Each structure stands twice: as C-alpha cells, then as structure tokens.
C-alpha cells in the first residue's frame, strides 16, 4: 500500500498588485511527488487552476495520457485505462520556458491518492550490484588494483633486501611505523592545530597530534614550559623555510654552512655561477661560512668575522655532510655578538642527539629543526622545536636584547607559517607514525641502537683508512664519513654508479680540495641503515673491503676506457670483476633481515 504524506510545499507566482488569497486547500500527495500551486492571479477567477502534482519519480504515460505503473526495465508494462483516471495535457509558458501540465478531465482537483492503485514503486534491482562493485573496488589489494605498481614495489623491496644501503640519510622503519603510514588515518583532513581545526570530526586526530608533541619533547628531554614543537611539516626543508618565513621579512639575512663544506641547500645556496638554488636564497639574502680546506673542520674564527660583518638575522648551524661535532657554545657566542637567532638543523644527527651520543643543541639554540626519518627511523617528514617563555635577561650585547620580562615570540609566528602560510592539512598518518618512532627513541633499546650506529661508522672509517683511503677530517664523530676519491683519479659520480652496479648504494658529494677548489670527487657513506639490519663492526669491516674493491674496479675501468661517461659505464656492467663483487654483496646482504618484512 502506498504511503500517503501531507505537504504544505507550493510554488506560487503572483503580481505585486494581486490581492491576498486564502491558503489553498492542502492536497494529499504521495511521497514521490510535490504539489505545484499556481497563483490564481495567472488565470481568471472564474476558472481557477487546480493544483498540479510535480512527480519526483519518473513515470511513463501513454499517448492518450492514461497512467501506467512504474516498472523495471524487464517488467511488462500494464496500463490502466479507467476513464476517471485519464488526464488532459495543457501547455503554457512559465518564465520564458514552455511547460506541460497533466490534469484530470473535467477540471476537478487531482488527487494522487486516487491514482495510487495504478502505480507500483519498485526499487532498482541494479542498486545492490552497483554497491557491490564500489565495495569490491575499494577493497582490492595493490596486486589486484595495479599490477604494474605492485611489480615495481616488489622489485624495489628485493633491491633493498639484496643490496647494501650506505646512504647516510636513509634507514629502515619498523613495522609499527609502516602500519601507521598505511592506515585509515590518511583519510582524515585536519587543517589547523589541535583544538582549532577548520574541519570537524578531529577529536581523535587531536589526541594523536598532542601525544606526538608530548613524545617529541620527552624524546629530547625538554620541558614543555620552555620548549614548544610543531610536528606538521612535510619535510625538514619545509620546516626550515617555515622558520625563515615566520621570523623574517623577504630579503632579510640568513647565514649557514656552504653546501660544498657540508651544509644543506635549504639554508640558502648559490651555485658558483650565482644561480639561486633554494627558496631560502630566492626569498632571503643568504651568505655562507665554510670549512678550512686543509682540515675539513669549520673555521670558527672566520665564521665569527663574517657574521659580525654580515649581521644575519638567523645564524644556522647543521648540515648534511659534516662528519664532526658542532661546537654549540662557540655558535651561541657568535650569535649573541651579532644579535642573531641561533638555529640548528639536526636532520642528520637527531637520533644521536636523542640518544645523548652527540652534543645537545637545546642547551644553546633558540630553534631546532629536523627530519623525522634518517637516524630517527620514523616516517619521512619534518619537525620544529622552538623556545617559549621568558628570554634570559642578557642574551646579547645588543641593548634591544637585554630587557627583562620579554617573552619568546617564536610559537605563534612559526605555527602560522607552517599553516596556513606554507602548508594545508597535515598528514595524520605521518604524525601517528612519528609518535610511534618518538616513543621508541626514548627507549633504552634505541639508545643502544644509536650507540652501535656510531661504533659502526667509526669501524668503517678505520677500515678504509687502513686501506690508505683519504677521509675528510680524518674520521667521524657521528654516523657518516666523507671519502675523498681524488687520489684515485675518480669522481663521486663515477664511483657511485660502479657501486650501484655492485648493489651498494652511496651518494656523491662535492668537497673542498686542499687548495680551496670545489671538487666533485667525494662520496658520503653512512651506517644507520645496515645497523638497522643487524650489522656490527665486523660486518662493516667487510663492507669497507667491498667499497675499496669497487673503487679499484672503477679506477681500472677509467684507465682502460678513459673518462667514464654514461655509455662506457653501461658497458662494464657485465664485466667479471663487477659480476663477482655483485654476487658477493648479494650473498652478504641477504644474511640480514629487512626490518618490517619477513625476509
């Protein structure tokens, strides 16, 4: 039986001079239609227009106007031809559009209730099949949904498992981090900060982000009254640029370690030809300090001299390829003398800092940024720590910095710079994964792991030095080392390609030669990834032998073929020496499990 509903929805069009009319009688309608009440001022009062139903469900009418029941596509159409249910068609123009009305013959008010016996409403039989298709599509595995991508992913997994990973900025995450990254948290959008979101439904997302902030402070032993943290940046480069954008006006000055000296391009970098490479150098004025080319160490005397002349607003310490500890007291002294904010980019060594295997930057710096992967073993992203609360009474010889009761103003500026100035919604799956990694970073097991990372790097350095290899600064204080290949007549580009043929991954770097000329003859090597796979000092001594043999192969091939370009490099892929080394590397690497996978 059809369900009958009452409706007071009507659509009337009348002139401004029309007299008010009493409310027309309500017409009972079925739940598949709406009554259209045309204002009587459109027609003579002697012949009022009856209410007209607007059908919401598509119905079929035969040529004579008789009502037919609603049917499925494969249903037989059976019509009623009762005289009392037949209708007339009437055409008229409404707002410039031709319209057609159907009403009962004789001009009587047409009630849908009277026509209900000639109609039967049927649910589309295809709706469940369509729903099933959508559900099936949403539940496919990668292998089912995209075999091509699945194939590439499997090949990459095998590459990681069968090779030796020595790129200093890469690592293996744990299974819990990987599960969070691939979780349902990626579905939620959450622009803003906890408690102040643009979208609703973020009560649990807020709890996750607040917990992540608390764990970030705890991992580095920080008091929440003196330090704040933003865990939303998509990368450390984004974090660095957010600091610059929040604290500086365009064109103001920053000063960081030169890229060939081991700095990072996000600190502001120009090519030797003067091209501005990073956003920091495009929107702000940057000036580098450098290492002493004879020793490879930062020349702090020249740094102080340059800083006092240049007067940067932000002085940056930290880099991507500096193998020694940073002298934070000296940096603090220089920053105070020139009135600069002191910022440390600990992207490379944040894990060592958390494990107290490296000097603590938080005792001296105003702002600290980092990646969240690399030595932290978290997801790929960035993080910003900033001082809060009262400034020290005497922070600088600049009188403007000696007043008491002045609060740090970093928090609001940096948070606003991250969002809405530079980013949209944070990646909630990343923040949850970071919270997991930070919990692990505060554990005793993680501290043992980072201690082993440092031991392994030193063992690798000693093994290379024993083979007469030249290391920048003569060794390492952290997880990475720089190998100067110029005595072997090699460039970093050629050497990394030969290593890749042997299933060893390292990365080329530019270095300063002893005469102060920038050379592409360096390679950076790091210990975190293979430490994560369970390798200890003896295994890193074996890896040193693999690296040295790869250098000998590359040097011999270069002597035979001349300067190795792309095509000659391809030609040596199948040579016996490389094939033998590749097989030995694979046999060695596959002894050690790949974290997060049963392989």
UniProtKB/Swiss-Prot annotation:
Any Pfam family: SHMT
Principal subcellular localization: cytoplasm
Cofactor(s) it depends on: pyridoxal 5'-phosphate
EC id: 2.1.2.1
Key words of the record: Cytoplasm, One-carbon metabolism, Pyridoxal phosphate, Transferase
Chain positions covered by the region annotation Disordered: 1-25
Residue numbers carrying N6-(pyridoxal phosphate)lysine: 374
GO cellular component, one term: cytoplasm
Reaction catalyzed: (6R)-5,10-methylene-5,6,7,8-tetrahydrofolate + glycine + H2O = (6S)-5,6,7,8-tetrahydrofolate + L-serine
The protein's assembly and partners: Homotetramer.
Function: Catalyzes the interconversion of serine and glycine.
Protein name in UniProt: Serine hydroxymethyltransferase 6
Organism: Arabidopsis thaliana
Encoding gene per record: SHM6
